[in-house]
Amino acid sequence: MPTALFAWRRTPPPFLIGGAEVTQQLLAEELAAAGWRTVYLGSHQAPWDRAPQLTQVRTFLDEHDTAYEESQEELRYRWNGMDCIAVPQQKITSVLQRLLARVRPDVVFTSQEGAADIAAQARPSALVAGILHSVSKTGLGVLTGRPHHGLAVSQFVLRRAPRTDGTRLSVLYPPFTLPEPGQRRRERTNAVLMVNPIPAKGADLLHQLIRRMPEQRFTLVEGWWNTTEEFASYPNVTYVPRVYDMSPLYRSHRLLLVPSTVEDAFPRVIIEAALHGTPSIGTDRGGIPEALGNTGIVLSAKAGAEEWAEALRAADHHTLGKEARQRATAFTRPRLPDLERLGIYPAANAPST
């Protein structure tokens, strides 16, 4: 039985912050479902400020009737076929060394904060794949640890990734899942949706758009941090706290807005919304046009509120939604064939060394 080890400095599943967590959890779950032994090492402290999260982790597991073992600040539990381990930041290196020796993984997946050190530590013992979730220093930093593979989540990221000796760069699009049967049946309102309304994601333009279109309902979903106070004065805005299951929101809105000012790698929300028949309007920044394909509306990053308002009014969300759903379905195929094509799956099927 092949063994995969996911090791990083963020929380292990099922605790989500953004797209990187979702992408890796779905990939790990696919490997586990295919018969791999899948181990997921993370931390119960945030890597950016070491804020403690252990209490929240315990509470969540208790609420979901998930048994766990706790010893010497290590928390172990099973989630969707994965063996999950959450430890303090200062123990990641020592626990990783122990896992490399005892579990003897065939492949180690790592990414984000501190991933270069993890890749360098694991490289002598196993095949190492660094997942490139963005073109930021955090997203591309794993490459300095010289992983055997650098898996870019889009062609855009692949083009921006620096070439590194000993690292093969390839595209591995994020995994997605089809909506549950019956989820598509929900009345769609005239409201439009935006996730993570912060400055980098286009909040300034959003404020202008909300004021320019008082007749249009906007639903905003909390993302990286709570910005509800910034939008509290608008009568045409509904602000929703962060939710794990976005399906009801996708199904009940006619458009998703992606007015990012930064170079997003490959926004998961575009594909997720499309799987529910909700098309998107986005800027031409980063990997947004790649995620939209020819089934959404792409506006220049320099476009103002009036141009966005015109696009909202003119969008044929019925036709665009059907086309978007059809295209997005292709992203729900298994990722194991891609790993096989890259030489990762055969390596995992070979005897461990």
Segments (PLM) and residue ranges:
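N-terminal strand-loop element at the rim of the active site
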Residues: 10-14, 33-83
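Short His-centered aromatic/hydrophobic patch
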Residues: 88-90, 110-115, 132
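Donor nucleotide-sugar binding/catalytic pocket of nucleotide-sugar-dependent glycosyltransferases
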Residues: 137, 146-182
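Conserved catalytic-core segment of nucleotide-activated headgroup transferases in glycan assembly
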Residues: 178-233, 239
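Acidic donor-binding loop of glycosyltransferase active sites
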Residues: 251-265, 278
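Short glycine-rich donor-binding/catalytic loop of glycosyltransferases
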Residues: 261, 278, 282-289, 301-303
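A charged, aromatic-enriched C-terminal amphipathic alpha-helix characteristic of glycosyltransferases
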Residues: 303, 316-345
